[in-house]
Amino acid sequence: MASSKEFLEYILEQLSEVEGITYRAMMGEYIIYYKGRIAGGIYDDRLLIKPVKSAIDYVSDIRYEVPYEGAKEMILIEEVDNKEYLTELFKAIYDDLPTPKKKK
């Protein structure tokens, strides 16, 4: 099932105080970037983020989900209605997000 544009827009609004949030549509889902680094994505209208150490430390009740068959587990963020929580979460994880690989 593809994610809705409405859910994407809602998440982007919730993250509006975080500078550098962008997204890319991919096969009916959305990859979320934070200052050029992949932070997570929206899959089946669920916000999932990379399971980096700072995210594991920040999220109190971790629930891992697979975004799609064959993918690595990611952390499901259930508190999408809490703008302050999402803002602080994304700011907390930035330094642990992998930097993009240089294209050859």
Residue ranges and their predicted role:
Residues 1-104:
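Charge-dense, helix-prone N-terminal extensions
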